[in-house]
């Protein structure tokens, strides 16, 4: 008998690579999609980012969506996909959080790549330890250059026990990177 062995980390079929959607020229007056993965901390982080961006851009608006499936692709979820597409149609760009565990980071990469492929400038936030896995997810779906900001969680607790104040303190240094990733020209 002869067997063929396949690796989930195999080479990407580059015939389906997708270029990045142009960034926004400003955040003023725009609606930002706030996408959170299944972790409770993702929603806390998104709310902190909303508070800060609202201070800087008074006309900015936000629309939230959380996908509570840890290891599922929105593209293949026939029950959730219509809700996702309706939400995505109402935003100008997406901040996609947060990929704190490897399995979640891989699927955050898959789902963030889908947002970019559907024409929305997307910025994905991950922690350094899961960044390579999240990027593999993006590459596997044909968006190898997805803009990503790494967030080094300064609090070593179970996600659900992190307070909003701890998130505010940690996110203060990362907000400029998120803003730049949404509006800076592609290089």
Please provide the spans of the model-predicted regions:
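Metallocofactor- and cofactor-centric catalytic cores in central/energy metabolism, strongly enriched
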Residues: 1-118, 126, 131-141, 148-168, ...
């Amino acid at each position: 008998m002869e067997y063929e062995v396949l690796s989930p980390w195999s080479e990407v079929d580059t015939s389906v690579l997708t270029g990045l959607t142009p960034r926004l020229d400003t955040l003023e007056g725009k609606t930002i999609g706030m996408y959170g993965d299944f972790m409770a901390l993702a929603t806390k982080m998104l709310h902190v980012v909303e508070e800060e961006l609202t201070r800087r851009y008074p006309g900015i608006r936000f629309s939230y969506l959380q996908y509570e499936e840890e290891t599922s692709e929105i593209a293949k979820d026939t029950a959730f996909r219509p809700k996702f597409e309706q939400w995505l149609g109402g935003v100008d760009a997406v901040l996609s959080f947060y990929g704190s565990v490897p399995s979640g980071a891989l699927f955050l990469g898959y789902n963030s790549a889908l947002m970019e492929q559907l024409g929305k400038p997307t910025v994905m936030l991950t922690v350094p330890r899961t960044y390579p896995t999240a990027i593999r997810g993006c590459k596997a779906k044909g968006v190898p250059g997805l803009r990503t900001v790494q967030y080094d969680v300064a609090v070593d607790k179970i996600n659900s026990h992190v307070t909003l104040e701890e998130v505010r303190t940690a996110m203060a240094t990362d907000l400029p990177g998120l803003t730049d990733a949404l509006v800076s020209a592609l290089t």
